[in-house]
Amino acid sequence: MISGIINLKKEAGMTSHDAVFKLRKILHEKKIGHGGTLDPDVTGVLPIAVGKATRVIEYMTEAGKVYEGEITIGFSTTTEDASGEVVQTTPITELDGATVDQAMASFEGEITQIPPMYSAVKINGKKLYEYARAGEEVERPQRQVKITEFVRTSPIELENGTARFTFRVACSKGTYVRTLSVDLGVKLGFASHMSALRRTASAGLTLDSSLSLSQISEMVEAGDQSFLLPIEFGVQDLPAVQVTEDDAKEISFGRFISINSQEPLVAAFLGNKVLAIMEKRGQVYKPRKVLSQ
């Protein structure tokens, strides 16, 4: 059985599940999962775990993300992105860059979002997009997310009653960048939507080192498994602690050990090898997942 982390470059037009399905065929391996859903139209980094590495996928999913995209101000859509139907138009003839930058900065920090109707969030066992497709509107729970950075990365282009510019956002798990784009428009007094998006970093993996499905397929055919990263890549967002060989033995038996840390979860290493995910219990740490077996 092969095992490891893959830094997949997801292409437009496929769901995250589609990507996993195709990788199962390419690798002839059933035990594969992804660390953070991307909408079909969104491209970029999709962390993939294979084999034993699927045991750390939840920690990859929890990690922060970085996106680059484009916001169009002047009209909004049903889906909050370019795939939806236009629902409101507010023509714009001028927009000051400093005003936009100030508005974007106001979203940095802890903010509250309401998931869009066209999303996979479940309400009463049913996904929101299923309600939306049936023409139903349901009450959606608010969620707290953290925006570390939200900045404009290009000049503002004014054309045909719209304003467009590119942006970069660094955010926590669960952030809807579509909704952030719409809320920015509201703050500026205009209808808006997210017109393009790609994920450039997730769980420590970056776009410049990601590989497409076709590249991975070619490597597999050539007998090259260098696309598989060690399982350690899946825990790099957790605080790392070094343990002794005696501690390593205790961990292998599932026993508590003392660790000089106040973090609720840590990744225990012996040298450069991750042994376990350890969970704080009072003054000691208990193995939550032993990975070295």
From Swiss-Prot:
Responsible for synthesis of pseudouridine from uracil-55 in the psi GC loop of transfer RNAs. Belongs to the pseudouridine synthase TruB family. Type 1 subfamily. Keywords: Isomerase, tRNA processing. It comes from Streptococcus thermophilus (strain CNRZ 1066). PANTHER family: PSEUDOURIDYLATE SYNTHASE TRUB1 (PTHR13767:SF2), TRNA-PSEUDOURIDINE SYNTHASE (PTHR13767). This is tRNA pseudouridine synthase B. The active site is at D39. InterPro entries: PsdUridine_synth_cat_dom_sf, PsdUridine_synth_N, tRNA_psdUridine_synth_TruB, TruB_C. It holds the Pfam family TruB_N. The lineage of its organism: Bacteria, Bacillati, Bacillota, Bacilli, Lactobacillales. It catalyses: uridine(55) in tRNA = pseudouridine(55) in tRNA. GO terms for biological process: mRNA pseudouridine synthesis; tRNA pseudouridine synthesis. Its EC number is 5.4.99.25. GO terms for molecular function: RNA binding; tRNA pseudouridine(55) synthase activity.
